[in-house]
Amino acid sequence: IDERDHRFVIGERTSEGFYRAEASLDSAIARGLAYAPYADLIWCETSTPDLDQAKAFSEAIRAEYPDKLLAYNCSPSFNWKKNLSDRDIARFQNELGAMGYKFQFITLAGFHALNHSMFQLARDYKSRQMSAYVELQEAEFAAESQGYSATRHQREVGTGYFDELTQAISGGQSSLSALSGSTEQAQFDED
């Protein structure tokens, strides 16, 4: 047992042989302090969105390492509205920033966004057929002015690069290129 963890080990073992340990703010702080000399930033993980715990963690780490960067997982596993008011949610990240949490992230945000949007598209496609997809495509076109670039999916995934690579390897004789002459290239304007 690592000496830094010893006071948190309960003494029991799991059926797999792992020691059971106390999951607490104190154990998180002790672990953070142990890693602080070696880590670029220290990640705080709480079981609910809890500014009091985040503050206690920050104060303990920064008391010994005042310039240490902190990270906080604004977890999608939290039921945010069940735990915080709209006002508290709106100020949550600013409060974290004031405590020194410079890297704030949502693990799996893309997973949730992708799955929810695909669910909506499938539901709408069932009832409105192609009109549902065209609505999505028009939203993509509208988002291009804000930097969205995935409307042209072949270009987005690097098809042009692999076409050039294939041509270089084959001495310009490959019939496997995908982007040149494609429907995407023909129908989507390059601005």
Give short role names for the model-derived ranges.
Residues 1-72, 76-78, 82-105, 119, ...:
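Alpha/beta enzyme core
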Residues 115-130:
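C-terminal helical cap(s) of enzyme catalytic domains, especially alpha/beta-barrels
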Residues 106-111:
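Short acidic/histidine-rich active-site segments
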Residues 129-180:
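Flexible C-terminal active-site loop/helix
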